[in-house]
From Swiss-Prot:
Protein known as: Probable ubiquitin carboxyl-terminal hydrolase 1
Lineage: Eukaryota, Fungi, Dikarya, Ascomycota, Taphrinomycotina
GO cellular component terms, A-Z: endoplasmic reticulum
Catalytic activity: Thiol-dependent hydrolysis of ester, thioester, amide, peptide and isopeptide bonds formed by the C-terminal Gly of ubiquitin (a 76-residue protein attached to proteins as an intracellular targeting signal)
Listed EC numbers: 3.4.19.12
């Protein structure tokens, strides 16, 4: 179909116009316009009509305007009578059905050309949507030619055909986006009279400056963007391949089986052994969920090399009823090759790939945020079915197993895996698929039934009754004892009083008497809050909170000691000070204290607590009596904004409202405290609340099935309540772990709740041996494994809420072994220590062996 307007009106329509369409009543004309908005969508072709003229016609039949006169199309055409570029519907043109177009021309006449276009149906049969192919793809066709051996037999087909070949002008033609690559091959064969059986291939050049029909090898090599149109992709349409106007280069095979371009492409193909570069992906409207998943898949270098080396071509299963006609695999291969030939730190658009995915799953076809893990699951399954080497799946009876004799279990497991691989054989099975053991047990008679099922990824639950783990610091009331780090572990529903009780027990085992404890959350040198005994630790103590437990004694008076760095005082104002570090405490025996004695005790306190030797003459004290009725620790919540009076008296009076500040200048501050973790809050307080080990253990816990999921027990011969237990039986080379952070189901993402727990997972040496089913400890498959160790190489992260969140990815570059963060088009290096975050959603591990 040509890109020019297809009909000359003067040869088909009369140049007449009328005052009123006489062939239809007035109301029928209005109904005709309304019905036509849907009518053209059901036909094979439609016509473009000048928007202003058509609006004038609508006004005319409603009695709101004059007769529009003949249809004028000149505004849509250029000087070559071709459709102008960048025209827009409802601004420059309207779309009408063929029947309405012909009727309007008969009524009003036509000045200009009729512009007819194909109506394409995009998507699966049940979800197809009409799309008018306004701008067909225009190609120029060239022939790869060796000027040195121009007369040799490798190009004999070129010299056996008549025009249009003998002209030096490139052959120009247009193609509809709905036509397949097979149709394009056929049209090229017809244009050049190429006989069946002649081996040739087509190269696509996106940005071509070629003007001659013949293209030399050196010219071919100089082209900026070249892609081979694979004969394996003949089922895909031009729309799906996502190629635009450009040039096609025809290359014939030499009788000896060689291709002229191989002298160049062999050189280029060596780069396949080079790891794929760092390339960003453009966000196509909330497509970050896809981009993050793709970055993880792209950095699965075993799969990427499989595609870049074209090994996939021989495996494509076009006829698999469970597959996608090979299109998902072909589109992904095209995306990888585009990325592979893109310079590092640049970006590409995955638009064609996204369209193909949306064509087979409308859930991913729009511009709404979707679940990245669900995309990964669909994508892996689609790749597997497109690349399944089993053309006709044989039927097998599933073996039953009602006992747990180790030999029986192993025999049935082997049978199940053998059956699975006889029906499923693909690179996805080889890399990603493992198998788990599923055991049902009747709650009445305890009859068991065991089955073995393959998995592509493990969905791990986050324990609902996870342990609360935190590090706290105990500060004793006496200056003769150093602070102590305590590692506490309690149930999530525990309270602060229970936390104190566990801390007291640990201290007593160390031979330390702590008295009544005060629990404080310390932030930037002040008491941010004093924790109440009834407070739940999971709600009041957050992951990064610094919790300090202050001991007490019945003897004497204990006062807080805070640390301040002097700030220059403005004339006429009090000294202002910045507080830092953790408040300490000092026990004094008398309310009347000599300043010099107090300084000596504080100097000793610093030495014991922090290992700092301070010259007595360098320490300056500030004193403040708090007016608040609250306790002494509550009093220093706002300590950084209180003004302290410099102690100059020889003797001072201490009471339970007194707070002492030790004042340091900038030089002392840097010199004395730089390496002091107690003062500078360098202690790592947070401990993981959930580990990946916790999740794996939770995965294998027996689960009580709901009543609606009652199991038909072969022992009871009736439906019975049952428990179900899953155990890992066989591990894949690439282990994908989905951390199930979201609860709730259905399409409304706003109703899905997210857990933001930090799940701590190893970056190196994840050992899964302890999580395998105990029945395979002596199994030959296990003994054949060099190790059960896995290294992390990619993470799919979800930030924020499900309905308005954002996805990013961390991935390890295989050549440099460096981790990078991918945020759509933004790429930056990241330290391996920083990739364990509470945003981790899908983990990608690779077996070390």
């Amino acid at each position: 179909m040509a890109s020019t307007a297809t009909q000359n009106a003067s040869t088909r329509y009369s140049q007449i116009w009328i005052d009123q369409p006489a062939s239809l009543p007035f109301q029928d004309s209005i109904n005709l316009i309304k019905e036509d908005k849907e009518k053209w969508k059901k036909e094979k072709t439609a016509f473009l009509i000048d928007y202003d003229w058509f609006e004038g016609y609508v006004d005319f039949i409603y009695g709101e305007g004059d007769n529009p006169g003949p249809i004028t199309q000149w505004r849509l055409l250029d000087e070559k009578n071709e459709l102008k570029h960048s025209l827009e519907e409802s601004i420059d043109y309207s779309i009408v059905s063929a029947s309405l177009w012909h009727m309007l021309v008969e009524w009003f006449g036509l000045e200009g050309l009729a512009i007819e276009r194909k109506v394409l149906l995009v998507g699966l049969a049940a979800e197809q949507k009409p799309f008018v192919d306004i701008y067909p793809i225009n190609f120029t066709l060239h022939v790869l030619f060796d000027p040195i051996n121009g007369e040799n037999t490798s190009y004999s087909p070129l010299y056996q055909i008549d025009e249009p070949y003998h002209s030096d002008e490139p052959y120009a033609f247009s193609f509809s986006r709905s036509d397949t690559l097979r149709s394009l091959y056929k049209q090229v064969m017809e244009a050049f009279q190429i006989s069946d059986g002649t081996s040739f291939r087509l190269w696509y050049l996106n940005k071509s400056n070629l003007s001659s029909r013949f293209v030399s090898l050196s010219e071919f090599n100089d082209q900026p963007a070249i892609a081979l149109l694979s004969e394996y992709a003949v089922c895909m349409t031009i729309f799906e391949i996502d190629i635009a106007d450009g040039s096609l280069l025809l290359e014939f095979q030499h009788p000896n089986g060689e291709w002229l371009s191989d002298s160049i492409t062999k050189e280029q193909n060596l780069t396949i052994n080079k790891e794929i570069g760092l390339c960003g992906l453009y966000n196509l409207g909330n497509s970050c969920y896809m981009n993050s998943a793709l970055q993880c898949m792209i950095h699965t270098h075993e799969l990427t090399k499989y595609f870049l080396s074209d090994s996939y071509e021989k495996d494509i299963n076009y006829n698999n009823p469970l597959g996608m006609m090979g299109k998902v695999a072909l589109s992904y291969a095209s995306l990888l090759k585009m990325i592979h030939h893109t310079a590092d730190m640049h970006s590409v658009s995955p638009s064609s790939f996204k369209f193909i995915i949306g064509e087979f799953n409308t859930y991913f076809s729009g511009y709404r945020q979707q679940d990245s893990q669900e995309f990964i699951a669909f994508f892996l399954d689609g790749l597997h079915e497109d690349l399944n080497r089993i053309q006709i799946k044989p039927y097998f009876e599933r073996p039953d197993l009602f006992d747990e004799h180790p030999l029986h279990v192993q025999r049935v497991a082997n049978q199940c895996w053998d059956i699975h691989t006889k029906r499923n054989d693909s690179i996805i099975v080889q890399l990603f698929q493992g198998m788990y053991k599923s055991t049902l047990e009747c709650s009445i008679c305890y009859q068991k039934s065991t089955a073995f099922d393959p998995f592509m990824y493990l969905t791990l639950p986050l324990p609902t009754s996870a342990k609360w783990r935190h590090k706290v610091v105990y500060v004793p009331p006496f200056g003769t004892q150093s602070p102590v780090e305590l590692y506490l572990e309690l149930l999530m529903e525990s309270t602060v009083i229970q936390m104190k009780f566990q801390a007291t027990e640990k201290l007593q085992k160390m031979g330390l008497e702590c008295g009544e404890l005060t629990a404080c959350d310390i932030y930037r040198g002040k008491v941010y809050k004093v924790l109440k005994n009834k407070d739940k630790i999971s709600k009041k103590i957050h992951k990064w909170d610094h919790v300090v437990l202050y001991g007490s004694t019945a003897n004497g008076l204990t006062i807080p000691i805070v640390h301040g760095c002097k700030r220059p005082a403005m004339p006429g104002s009090y000294q202002s000070n910045d507080v830092f570090g953790f408040p300490l405490q000092l026990n004094v025996r008398s309310r009347n204290v000599l300043t010099n004695d107090l300084v000596k005790e504080i100097v000793e306190l610093y030495r014991v607590y922090a290992g700092i030797d301070v010259a007595i003459g360098t320490l300056q004290l500030g004193l403040k009596r708090m007016e608040s009725k609250a306790g002494k620790w509550e009093c220093i919540k706002e300590i950084e904004v209180k003004r302290f009076e410099i102690v100059e008296e020889e003797e001072i009076v201490i009471d339970d409202k007194t707070v002492i500040m030790c004042l340091w200048n900038d030089q002392q501050y840097e010199k004395l405290f730089y390496n002091c973790e107690w003062i500078f809050e360098k202690i790592q307080f947070h401990m993981e609340s959930i580990t990946l080990e916790d999740c794996l253990l939770e995965f294998s816990k027996p689960e009580q099935l709901d009543l609606q999921d009652s199991w038909y027990c072969p022992g009871c011969k009736a439906f019975r309540p049952a428990t179900k237990r899953l155990e890992i039986w066989r591990l894949p080379k690439i282990l994908v772990i989905h951390l199930n952070r979201f609860s709730g189901h259905g399409g409304d993402l706003r109703r899905r709740r997210k857990r933001r727990d930090l799940v701590v997972y190893p970056v190196f040496d994840l050992n899964l041996k302890q999580f395998l089913s105990p029945f395979i400890k002596d199994h030959e498959w296990l003994s054949s494994q060099k190790s059960m160790l896995y290294d992390l190489y990619a993470v799919d992260n979800h930030h924020g809420f499900m309905s308005n969140g954002h996805y990013t990815a961390y991935a390890r570059d295989a050549s440099s072994q460096t981790f990078f963060k991918f945020d759509d088009t933004a790429i930056c290096e990241i330290d391996p220590e920083d990739i364990v975050t509470s945003s981790a959603y899908v983990l990608f591990y690779r077996a070390k062996n």
